[in-house]
Amino acid sequence: TRIFVKEFTFMSDVAGSSNITFSYTKHFNLAEVAAVDAEHWGNYTAYDNFALVPMTINGVQEGDIVYYMVDTRVIDWQKESQWLAEVAQEKNIKNQYHNCYMQLEYEKDYIIVAVAKDKNGNFGTLFTTELYLYKSDAADAANYNYVEVK
């Protein structure tokens, strides 16, 4: 699994207090998790070529507006304003402040782009990270424990 993280700070009158980050320690094969946790993932039994990635979200407070998206495009690190404009759209608003799950196909380049707006309406640091997951690196589904998204 390859990970590359780059943070950007926006030039604005007032810097936001929310500096969102995403992290994970392991991923699971989605079909295997569906077999052991049908209550939450039973509809994914045919998704053998997908990873279930439990993500931890840090740097935001309840009441912040959290935006994030997963994309497969190659990021141009020189165009941070373009990525802010793309992620900070209503369709990317998520009411998740602590954790989330991502279902990602194996052996594809992904980028997670996220930003949060604090209670004063100011954007914090733009977060980006690249992911490339291998099926052979999946953790044993017997060790999977569902955590409620919040």
For every predicted segment, state its role.
Residues 35-38, 50-83:
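Solvent-exposed loop/turn segments flanking beta-strands in beta-repeat/beta-sandwich domains
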Residues 79-93:
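Solvent-exposed serine/threonine-rich low-complexity stretches and specific carbohydrate-binding patches
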Residues 14-16, 89-94, 100-109:
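Surface-exposed, short loops/turns at beta-strand junctions within beta-sandwich domains
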Residues 2-20, 117-144:
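Extracellular fibronectin type III
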Residues 43-49:
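Short, solvent-exposed loop/linker segments at the N-terminal edge
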Residues 3-5, 52-54, 97-99, 109-111, ...:
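Intrinsic-disorder/low-complexity, polar/charged segments enriched in Ser/Thr/Lys/Arg/Asp/Glu/Gln
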Residues 13-33:
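Proline/serine/threonine-rich low-complexity linkers at boundaries of modular beta-sandwich domains
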